[in-house]
């Protein structure tokens, strides 16, 4: 029988770096997490995962089976370097090839959701043409994802193009495809001048997962939980009351910390305490 408890996961970059997924999933299990979200970022090291051999992919699947800790989602931030909105045709083609490989990888290892970065371009100047190319790139990507039965989900970003659920819903309506949904980050959502609770309510029916982190205006990473502007309890209450029953993912970048496991355990306890206050989990 499937568990009715709320799935709580941890971001790969919160845990010690390395390529041994069996060790990573064992640690996540020890720390009490249900799943780990894989990162495929713009570094050559993590991009190379998309070229893993059949044996390497099977090793990941076997690690999931052995530990019981799932890897249901991928954070695909590689498109910062190879954006779908690039005016350089070669760069844009690389971006689409990364998307194709990511979808194939997801299909092979059982990843259900690929979180997309909502940048038309990142290191270049945006304009109407970059936005048009980005829209067209998303359309092509969703067609590939549909055939593979893999969901593409747009993150709410640290970037004006996609800094609210309302804006992301515009793309969902434009694409009009069940394999394109939303993956909001309540930290990013709170760092902008958004009515956060109204935005979360607007996204219900399209939200497939939620990133949990703290932020400050203009500061989107490495803000310790409780030191930023996010009203976690209200966000959790709103999502619960709106009928959201999906996973929550604690997003941290503690892989280079002196003791990543201790940092993660501290964050886990803090987040679960706020979830308990919101009536989502039993108090420890």
Swiss-Prot record:
InterPro entries registered for this protein in UniProt: L-Ru-5P_3-Epase, L-Ru-5P_3-Epase_Enterobacteria, Sugar_Epim/Isomerase, Xyl_isomerase-like_sf, Xyl_isomerase-like_TIM-brl
Record's keyword terms, sorted: Isomerase
Gene3D superfamilies assigned: Divalent-metal-dependent TIM barrel enzymes (3.20.20.150)
Any one Pfam family match given in the protein's UniProt record, by short name: AP_endonuc_2
Induction: Induced by L-ascorbate. Repressed by UlaR.
An annotated Gene Ontology molecular function: L-ribulose-5-phosphate 3-epimerase activity
EC class name: isomerase
Pathway(s) where this gene product acts: Cofactor degradation; L-ascorbate degradation; D-xylulose 5-phosphate from L-ascorbate: step 3/4
GO biological process: L-ascorbic acid catabolic process
Catalysed conversion reaction: L-ribulose 5-phosphate = L-xylulose 5-phosphate
E.C. number(s) listed in UniProt: 5.1.3.22
NCBIfam families (alphabetical): hxl6Piso_put, PRK13209.1, PRK13210.1
Annotated family: Belongs to the L-ribulose-5-phosphate 3-epimerase family.
Role noted for this protein: Catalyzes the isomerization of L-xylulose-5-phosphate to L-ribulose-5-phosphate. Is involved in the anaerobic L-ascorbate utilization.
Name of the protein described by the UniProt record: L-ribulose-5-phosphate 3-epimerase UlaE
Record gene name: ulaE
């Amino acid at each position: 029988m499937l568990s009715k408890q709320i799935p709580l996961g941890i971001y790969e970059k919160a845990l010690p770096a390395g390529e041994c997924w069996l060790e990573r999933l064992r640690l996540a299990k020890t720390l009490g997490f249900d799943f780990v979200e894989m990162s495929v970022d713009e570094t050559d090291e993590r991009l190379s995962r998309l070229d893993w051999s059949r044996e390497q992919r099977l090793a990941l699947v076997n690690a999931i089976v052995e530990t019981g800790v799932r890897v249901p989602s991928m954070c695909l931030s590689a498109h910062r370097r190879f954006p779908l909105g690039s005016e350089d045709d070669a760069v844009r083609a690389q971006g689409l090839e990364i998307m194709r490989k990511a979808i194939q990888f997801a299909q092979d290892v059982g990843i259900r959701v690929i979180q997309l970065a909502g940048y038309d371009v990142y290191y270049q100047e945006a304009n109407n043409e970059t936005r048009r190319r980005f829209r067209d790139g998303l359309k092509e990507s969703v067609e590939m994802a549909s055939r593979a039965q893999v969901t593409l989900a747009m993150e709410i970003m640290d970037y004006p193009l996609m800094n609210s659920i309302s804006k992301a819903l515009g793309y969902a309506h434009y694409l009009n495809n069940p394999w394109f949904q939303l993956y909001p980050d309540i930290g990013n959502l709170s760092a902008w001048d958004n009515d956060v609770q109204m935005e979360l309510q607007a996204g219900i029916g399209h939200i497939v997962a939620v990133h949990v982190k703290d932020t400050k205006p203009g500061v989107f990473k490495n803000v310790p939980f409780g030191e930023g502007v996010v009203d976690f309890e209200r966000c959790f209450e709103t999502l619960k009351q709106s009928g959201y029953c999906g996973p929550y993912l604690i997003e941290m970048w503690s892989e280079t910390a002196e003791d990543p496991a201790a940092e993660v355990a501290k964050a886990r306890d803090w987040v679960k305490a706020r979830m308990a206050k919101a009536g989502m989990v039993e108090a420890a």
